[in-house]
Amino acid sequence: MEGADLLTAGVLFLFAAVAAVPLAARLGIGAVLGYLLAGIAIGPWGLGFISDVDEILHFSELGVVFLMFIIGLELNPSRLWQLRRSIFGVGAAQVLLSAAVLAGLLMLADFLWQAAVVGGIGLAMSSTAMALQLMREKGMNRSESGQLGFSVLLFQDLAVIPALALVPLLAGSVDEHFDWFKVAMKVLAFAVMLIGGRYLLRPVFRFIAASGVREVFTAATLLLVLSAALFMDALGLSMALGTFIAGVLLAESEYRHELENAIDPFKGLLLGLFFISVGMSLNLGVLYTHLLWVAASVVILVVIKMLTLYLLARLYGIRSSERMQFASVLSQGGEFAFVLFSTASSQRLFQGDQMALLLVTVTLSMMTTPLLMKGIDKWLSRRLNGPEENDEKPWVEDDKPQVIVVGFGRFGQVIARLLMANKMRITVLERDIGAVNLMRKYGYKVYYGDATQVELLRSAGAEAAESIVITCNEPEDTMKLVALCQQHFPHLHILARARGRVEAHELLQAGVTQFSRETFSSALELGRKTLVSLGMHPHQAQRAQLHFRRLDMRMLRELIPEHSDMVQISRAREARRELEEIFQREMQQERRQLDGWDEFE
């Protein structure tokens, strides 16, 4: 693709995303389906703006590559070892069972047995990009079902290597003299990558970080990700697997969060490009001429994979309320099918339109997943939020809560327990089904679902409540919920959790004055105890803590992001001098006073 054509394509992609995704969000069908529909619209079977789909699809796989790098950063080697049972147990069982059943059905549909085996393996794979995106949107990444889903996806990425090696064997085109030397060199190169990454990456990033130039750090991160992807591709392995390993090697480094922040914007854009490319690849001509065959194959594919995944989730011990989410989020075909089927086609395993039919089936199955997840969410919401005959009667006296608590993680649990201990009427909103089930067992009123949905807030009693406490893990969810409450429930007193100073500034700018930084209070308390351990009187240490809190909050309100760096630095130095003067006066006053109270727990 020429430079001018590439620029035009980039503009079209951005326009399609900007136009389609907000519309999809407004319709409640999710961003992923919006990207897919945008791809259909601008692709060769839509308005025809772009015709070179294969090249763009290959480039857009970088979105999956960046996503796997970030996932690797969140998993250290010890955590990965803990998942070995689910990766090689449940993951292997899912691929083998699904592939066997689907291959049998393809043979009944007049596929050669060799083509049926390749087709069954390809259809058994799920979309890593789509599944992980949906799991994050639904809050599944913290749940047991989300961890199991990730394990299955990781095994599927590992299965890419033997699956591609199987194609020439099935086609009968393998060389009589197997090149063991070439295989040994690939294994050696892979080992060098692991050992070199283990001992060289951290010193290299330490050297780069010492320069103090953020752009260089971002460039080094991009260089690492793209180099790992190209290296694995040259070895004939999965690019996503290479960047995942690079992420795992850096998971315990001090640069983990900075690496994640540097990559995140590129990951989001390239993932969007990937989904648009998948939509562009949908062959509407084949769909039109084989409509019944394709429709039946999509339904059969989704049903078989859901049944297999549901059965494995049950055997693994996943809660019944989480099994449907787990089964549906992995029910689609995946991006690996495009690679495997193209390789098989080059070996002449498929006849006629067989490859096109399989690719259309995979693409349409990917489009069904967001709709399927939305339907299951509604079903779970009715099941969990509706009254049941066997439910214990909650201790709340009526259906009008005083406080709505959003989120029942570690932060939200402490708040909810304190409120309940003081007989406050509360309603908890939570996206984690396991937490919902636990709360309902104890008789507390709890709603399952996404708190950023207005109807859920209404059914939870937002119109009658006095306050809402927002403890979301994601800052984006917090700000979205703040805007929603200010628009639809302006009477609510909003209290929120802030992860740090940046989120605190965003809350202040949105008009939220009551918030708590999650580590600030505990750090102050530990600092107070440290002062006492160094010989300071408990009463004096408490006053020092209060002065520090008051001055820090004043600095937080004054040092808003609109000010330049020099203004912020100047005010920070001034505040530090003021704090030292206050402490000096306090120490002189304490010497003239009698002792106050002693240390307490």
Swiss-Prot record:
It is found in: Cell inner membrane. Residues 400-519 form the RCK N-terminal domain. Keywords: Antiport, Cell inner membrane, Cell membrane, Ion transport, Membrane, Potassium, Potassium transport, Transmembrane, Transmembrane helix, Transport. The keyword Cell inner membrane applies. GO terms for cellular component: plasma membrane. The chain crosses the membrane at residues 4-24, 29-49, 55-75, 87-107, 111-131, 152-172, 177-197, 207-227, 230-250, 262-282, 284-304, 324-344, 356-376. GO terms for molecular function: glutathione-regulated potassium exporter activity. It is a multi-pass membrane protein. Disulfide bonds: none annotated. One of its GO terms (biological process) is proton transmembrane transport. InterPro entries: Cation/H_exchanger_TM (IPR006153), K/H_exchanger (IPR004771), K_H_efflux_KefB (IPR020884), K_uptake_TrkA (IPR006036), Na+/solute_symporter_sf (IPR038770), NAD(P)-bd_dom_sf (IPR036291), RCK_N (IPR003148). Interacts with the regulatory subunit KefG. Belongs to the monovalent cation:proton antiporter 2 (CPA2) transporter (TC 2.A.37) family. KefB subfamily. This is Glutathione-regulated potassium-efflux system protein KefB.
